[in-house]
């Protein structure tokens, strides 16, 4: 979500949040949110800077992937929060360094994110 003003981004977030709540069937929605305000682009000819409010909402199906609970070789201590959902994967155990791969990260994203069907239901509501 992007808006040149604070009120606009709040209104859009509230609108989307109401729609998001409906796909979780009266349970608290599992979401990660990152928001920021600041320089988005610079006019290279020396003109005005463009500043805007921004927000990304990551819709979740569950808090932790199965590998978080697994033991032995299948265990991987990853519990995606906002850093991981934004593409930064801090590895807290040395033993997990050799286990993490692009394929495993993709699998974790798919496991903890909403399914295609749930996303379609949400986009149908907001169209």
Model-derived regions, located:
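HIT superfamily nucleotide-processing domains
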Residues: 1-127
């Amino acid at each position: 979500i992007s808006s040149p003003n604070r009120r606009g981004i709040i209104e859009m977030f509230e609108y989307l949040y109401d729609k998001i709540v409906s796909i979780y069937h009266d349970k608290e929605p599992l979401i990660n949110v990152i928001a920021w305000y600041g320089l988005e682009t610079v006019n290279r000819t020396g003109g005005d800077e463009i500043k805007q409010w921004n927000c990304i909402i990551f819709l979740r199906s569950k808090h932790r992937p199965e590998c978080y609970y697994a033991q032995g070789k299948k265990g991987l201590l990853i519990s995606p929060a906002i850093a991981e959902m934004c593409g930064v994967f801090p590895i807290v155990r040395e033993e997990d360094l050799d286990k993490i791969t692009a394929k495993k990260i993709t699998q974790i994203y798919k496991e903890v994110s909403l399914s295609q069907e749930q996303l379609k239901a949400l986009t149908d509501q907001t169209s």
